[in-house]
Amino acid sequence: MTAACAATIERLAVLGELVPVTTRVNEQYRRVRLPGPAPLYAITTNGAEILVNGKPDRDWSRSVADRLAAGFPLDAVWEQASHVCHPEFTVKLRNADGLFCYAVVRPKHLPMGFAEDVAGWAAERGWRTSLQGRKLYWVPETLTKSAAVREVARRMGADRVLAAGDSLLDVDLLLAADAGIHPRHGELFDQGWSAPTVTCTESSGELAGEQIVGWFEREAGGASA
């Protein structure tokens, strides 16, 4: 993160409620340090957890667990992932708090068509996949970031939601927001994804990060275009 990016993030905390949203589980999220004051709300585990002042909202967690219980079970997905993720290209397979799973892979060693095959298998069972760098995720379609964001926005009485993301697991979030942005790199850019209410940065890498937080600041009314 550049110094300019960090400074803009600190200013954003004055313009509105900055809510981190991540696929990371709580333990992984707590290792992340963002500039500025600690957020009142954070959304982790791809929407399964809403943290309020750093503590999980148990009612929300229970409602998510009840919703997921009606779907195709994680145990069966884990079994399939264990079967198809061969040692030649898989470093390890991980369970994310009993909600979804992911494999740490060597992307350059993945067999031709592997990502498409696992995506097809998952889709037939109400799950979706996302390849983000070295991590290949299997996540239930009913576990979404957008549902958690809508709940947080409702509690806050927010009249406008802005969002940023770079993976297929961010699509529902970007589409649910009033406006969104994604960087000129990552899974969404590589797949040519676009939407009328979502813009793309002009640059990639660290400069994309600066452009994203600058976009947030302008959209929130804190800087001139």
Regions found by a protein language model. Name each.
Residues R24-I43, H109-T129:
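Substrate-recognition/cap helix-loop segment adjacent to the acidic, metal-dependent catalytic center
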Residues W138-V139, S146-A225:
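Mg2+-dependent phosphoryl-transfer enzymes with acidic/Ser/Thr/Gly-rich catalytic loops
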